[in-house]
Amino acid sequence: MSDSSDGYAKPMTINFGPQHPAAHGVMRLILEMSGEVIERIDPHIGLLHRGTEKLIEYKTYLQALPYFDRLDYVSPMSQEHAYSLCVERLLGCEVPIRAKYLRVIFCELTRLLNHLLNVACQALDSGATTPLLWIFEEREKILSFYERASGARFHSAYIRPGGLAADVPDGLLDDIHEFTNYFPKLLDSVDDLLTENSIWKQRNVEIGKVTKQQALDWGFSGPMLRACGIPWDLRKSQPYEIYDILDFKVPVGSNGDCYDRYLVRMAEIRESLYILEQCLRDIPSGPVKTDDRKIAPPKREELKYSMEALIHHFKLFSEGYKVPEGEAYAAVEAPKGEFGVYIVSDGTNKPYRCRIRSPGFAHLQAIDAMARGHMLADLPVIIGSLDIVFGEIDR
């Protein structure tokens, strides 16, 4: 950087991304710098825009489901959960109790997947490589649970309107239970390595600070909001599935900085493990999808002897089901915050309009206020603490 005649560094405008290892996706930031200090950030989005909301209007309600796996591809089951809840509200459909338990189990496993990746990458952005190697080994085990249940490691399409695609295979719940028993040891190791580490604290404490009022004004949700000291969690405030009968705490921070966001996510991982233990202990037997054959397909073995089952199967996968005219909004406490789906139905087999509320969009818009006055080296840490994925931001 060249110096001006009076000895001060000239203001400079630089590009951060869209191809940058710390950008967490195809993000382009226009930085206005004064020396090493950030004076202004202009985020440019849309580089991963695929027109998801418009594409959904041309698909049946079942065909639209896989699009939600591809939004926040780090935590896919949370999004298909929100979509399924929204369609079920329009249909007036009740889901069997076992399906509700399994939905919560996989949504909490999804929370583990998301928060583990975030902690690992935030540490990597700060210069710590060891947690990444430890954590990715455990994430692979969770992804294997995904694969055994749905056949896919990422894009599962497992949670569907009316219940689940299928029941879990024998032995899977036992393996998840075993995982919840030994996993806290790894979490303790990561905790010991990072939480009181002086370099980690220097890189995160008082960096990217947000006040309670700013968080509310920007529309924050999830760990970003709770790190500011506001205990808002949809699983507690607007319970869905079986969260109203589960015992868990809502971790909150106090300073609203990068360090508090890290602490909140680590605490949420432990709470998710506690929720998993309760679900695995209490889960009942029974069906995992509604018995309304106009919504959920019959079992495969029924097709061999029942003409009626064959007709239902053919109609569901060729034409789909018609959803009563109306509109509905459903939101879930996704790992990144409040993920909402708003659907308008015109009484046909395809949505008239589908609007998606992604938490990362609200968080990214605050990056200018969060990073202003900080050094350039602090920017990757702030981006890491935001926990953004551009599949859901650009849609």
From Swiss-Prot:
It holds the Pfam family Complex1_49kDa. It comes from the Bacteria. Its main location: membrane. One of its GO terms (cellular component) is plasma membrane. It is found in: Cell inner membrane. Keywords: Cell inner membrane, Cell membrane, Membrane, NAD, Quinone, Translocase, Transport, Ubiquinone. It is a peripheral membrane protein. It catalyses: a quinone + NADH + 5 H(+)(in) = a quinol + NAD(+) + 4 H(+)(out). GO terms for molecular function: NAD binding; NADH:ubiquinone reductase (non-electrogenic) activity; quinone binding. SUPFAM superfamilies: HydB/Nqo4-like. InterPro entries: NADH_Q_OxRdtase_suD (IPR001135), NADH_UbQ_OxRdtase_49kDa_CS (IPR014029), NDH1_su_D/H (IPR022885), NiFe-Hase_large (IPR029014). Its EC number is 7.1.1.-. Belongs to the complex I 49 kDa subunit family. NDH-1 shuttles electrons from NADH, via FMN and iron-sulfur (Fe-S) centers, to quinones in the respiratory chain. The immediate electron acceptor for the enzyme in this species is believed to be ubiquinone. Couples the redox reaction to proton translocation (for every two electrons transferred, four hydrogen ions are translocated across the cytoplasmic membrane), and thus conserves the redox energy in a proton gradient. NDH-1 is composed of 14 different subunits. Subunits NuoB, C, D, E, F, and G constitute the peripheral sector of the complex. This is NADH-quinone oxidoreductase subunit D. The lineage of its organism: Bacteria, Pseudomonadati, Pseudomonadota, Alphaproteobacteria, Rickettsiales.
